[in-house]
Amino acid sequence: MTRSIVEQAHDMYDAVPYEVPVPGESLYGLLDDAARLYPDRIALDYFGATTTYAQVRDQVLRAARVLHEAGVGPGDTVAIALPNCPQAFVAFYACMRIGAIAAQHNPLAPASEIAGQLGRHGGKVAIVWEKCVDAYPLDVLDTVFTVDISHGMPASQRLLLRLPVARARQTRNQLRGTVPAGTRSWDRATASSTPIDPSFPLPSPDDLAVILHTSGTNGIPKSAPLTHRNIGVNVNQCMFWVWKLHEGAETFFSL
């Protein structure tokens, strides 16, 4: 006899706790723990180009120095407008390392919408996809870092993008854009940097970590600030809710 969905749900009652532990560290601690426990495990897979947790942490620490040398300090806001790419991951955790606030922007949002969001959070440094850089003018921001999202692809794919054929040009134009004078290459800056000093203070769990922007379905998108503890609790909720996860052995597909 087929059991009802309610009867099946009863089997799960003991699997998910009624209370979830509240984290006592910053979000950077999550990455640092993963790099310490699983240094050689693959953290990112981007079109077949893989990066281990240890390599990602090294990139994050280099990027943290780049931001700090650009004038970003604890409590400052950094605008990030990137699609899913390794640089987006690194930029976010670089902010988390130095206690900056990562303001996540839709890279396809119109310039008028971005102007309002920049005005609300007051960030003076932006890390943006080349295709949307025009929405982040230097007369509003002190520093604009541009990101080539093809940079993290395997060398063979980047070589194909440079072929003088129509299909390669079309794909290249979808991925890359014209970079205005006065901007800086995020990829070159982070590659030539050195890791930030280990003595640089970590943020506290109650410091602001992220500003997320709502969809604006009912009007102008709102800016929602969240602390390290807010996001950390959400991470713990996901870990306990998806209760059959095996630590260090799962793969997540991001769209």
Language-model features, listed with the residues they occupy:
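Conserved adenylate-forming
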Residues: 67-72, 193-206, 211-254
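Surface-exposed loop/turn positions
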Residues: 42, 76, 100, 206-207, ...
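Structural core segment of the AMP-binding/adenylate-forming
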Residues: 69-70, 97-188
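Conserved short alpha-helical elements in the N-terminal third of ANL/AMP-binding
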Residues: 94-98, 250-251
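Conserved AMP-binding/adenylate-forming core of the ANL superfamily
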Residues: 22-23, 32, 42-85, 89-93, ...
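Alpha-helix-centered segments that form part of catalytic cores
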Residues: 24, 28, 172-205
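Conserved G/P- and acidic residue-centered "switch" motifs that form tight phosphate/ATP-binding loops
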Residues: 78, 99, 216-217
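Flexible, non-catalytic linker and terminal segments flanking ANL/adenylate-forming cores
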Residues: 1-24
